[in-house]
Amino acid sequence: MAVITKIDTFAAIGAGVIGSGWVARALANGLDVLAWDPAEGAEMQLRANVENAWPALERAGLAPGASPARLHFVPTIEACVADADFVQESAPEREALKLELHERISRAAKPDAIIASSTSGLLPTDFYARAHRPERCIVGHPFNPVYLLPLVEVLGGERTAPDTVDAALGIYRALGMRPLRVRKEVPGFIADRLLEALWREALHLVDEGVATTGEIDDAIRFGAGIRWSFMGTFLTYTLAGGEAGMRHFMQQFGPALELPWTKLVAPKLTDALIDRVVEGTAEQQGPRSIKALERYRDECITEVIAAIAAVKARHGMRYED
């Protein structure tokens, strides 16, 4: 089917942490943005989130004409999507809610507008079941902060047209993102399945008194996390195999997978475990506010991305290589 491949107006359904991240990214790319959220105080919170993100976006580089003034908060779903070229829904992860929302969104949107959901694990075939023209409906799952992290996982449902996925990949690239096409419709997609495994193991380590939340974060940020930011998991292990590469690594360390060290099944979230996690992270946060931590995080992300891009350029590589 024919869908829009170049956008001027971006619609955001839902203006929470993820939705406001999409709004900030779209504004930074010089688009007009329409937003809707039924929550009380949503517009004020959305504008505050954009304001907090804007310094990092300025450091990263704004498109010509980019301005928070191009954000328009509207009272209904229909007013939000009627003139939009691209719709990004970021509502809570409840299938029944998304079914209802996408029935309304798809009937009010332009027939050639692409409709995307930020869902982190629900399957598009299921929640687009009542959508009008489901062939133009996809998942575009981002990562927080959406306005800085480039990864977005893209996939369609059983009735999504392949041309729609291709067009969405191009639009996300135009927004400065690194789209990753998910080959199969599976719960959790790719990145969140990996992150969930790590999160479960981290909770086990806290629950068993092996480490505090701060010590676990240190194990990541001073170790594997640094390598992951530019090399990922498989290429890192390729180097661990020495000159013989991955085959040697698999032969040498593969048998250790049978031990196993990991628990895999999530621990029971008892009150005691929740208290340990909350108290540990509160100690890590210290006197800093969430907004202050967000600004610190954003500056670190922009500097890390810039540094990696500069080193890759010296080696004849693009940032996304």
Curated annotation (Swiss-Prot):
A family per Pfam: 3HCDH
GO cellular component terms attached to this protein's record: cytoplasm
Keywords recorded for this protein, A-Z: Cytoplasm, NAD, Oxidoreductase
Biological process (GO), any one: catabolic process
Stretch forming the signal peptide: none
Matches recorded under Gene3D superfamilies: N-(1-d-carboxylethyl)-l-norvaline Dehydrogenase, domain 2 (1.10.1040.10), NAD(P)-binding Rossmann-like Domain (3.40.50.720)
Keyword check for Cytoplasm: yes
Gene Ontology molecular-function annotations: carnitine 3-dehydrogenase activity; NAD+ binding
Enzyme Commission no: 1.1.1.108
UniProt xrefs under SUPFAM superfamilies: 6-phosphogluconate dehydrogenase C-terminal domain-like (SSF48179), NAD(P)-binding Rossmann-fold domains (SSF51735)
Compartments, as annotated in UniProt: Cytoplasm
Pathway note: Amine and polyamine metabolism; carnitine metabolism
Entry-linked InterPro entries: 3-OHacyl-CoA_DH_NAD-bd, 3HC_DH_C, 6-PGluconate_DH-like_C_sf, 6PGD_dom2, L-carnitine_dehydrogenase, NAD(P)-bd_dom_sf
Biological role: Catalyzes the NAD(+)-dependent oxidation of L-carnitine to 3-dehydrocarnitine.
HAMAP family in alphabetical order: L_carnitine_dehydrog
Record family assignment: Belongs to the 3-hydroxyacyl-CoA dehydrogenase family. L-carnitine dehydrogenase subfamily.
Record's protein name: L-carnitine dehydrogenase
